[in-house]
Amino acid sequence: MTRKLKVDLFTDVVCPWCLIGSVRLDKAIAALPEDVEVEVENHPFYLDPSVPAEGVDVGHMLKTKYGRDPQEMWARPQAEAKKSGVDLDLSRQPRMFRTAKAHTITRLAKSRDTQHALANAIAEAYFLDHRQINDDEVLADIAAGHGFDRDEALRLMNDPRELATTEQLAVAAANQGIQGVPFFVFDGKFAMSGAQPEEVFERAFAELLKPEVASQ
């Protein structure tokens, strides 16, 4: 008998820790017994809702906000990414962009059973391929490989009603107390924040699979 679990995952595309956290989550899922099936539902969150349409220079923003050398701040996430087999060089993606359209097409991929794969693909395009994910054409190219017709993807990511729904969900996540991402909710039973070590994800699933927890 298949045991079904669910993970609600709150991320923002332009958050390097979200990329790392998603990789670690997926590794933990891949290591589960074959009779355990995990649904991952991605939810929108905005690291900075005030980012202008043209984006901002990440290095300048970090230096202005924190008064530190961006290379120094990038060192830790890059090192953590390497531990999980991800070759991350944050200096090669100099700009942070608005993510409403990326979140919208990701949200709408849920009905096509490609949502988590699409979310990962967009994050990888941004951080690893250094693509401009504020560009509709770039997003449409990625979506076309995950169950969307290209023209349909362009229409949906620019639909004012769909964008408004995404905005409402992102605001609701913040209002529920989520202050940083990645943020994980495991089967509605407990939550975890941050790109924790891989063994922490493994322990979380082991806890969920305990008979006394499963019956709650």
Residue map of PLM features:
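Structural alpha/beta surface segment adjacent to cysteine/selenocysteine redox centers
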Residues: 22-126, 211
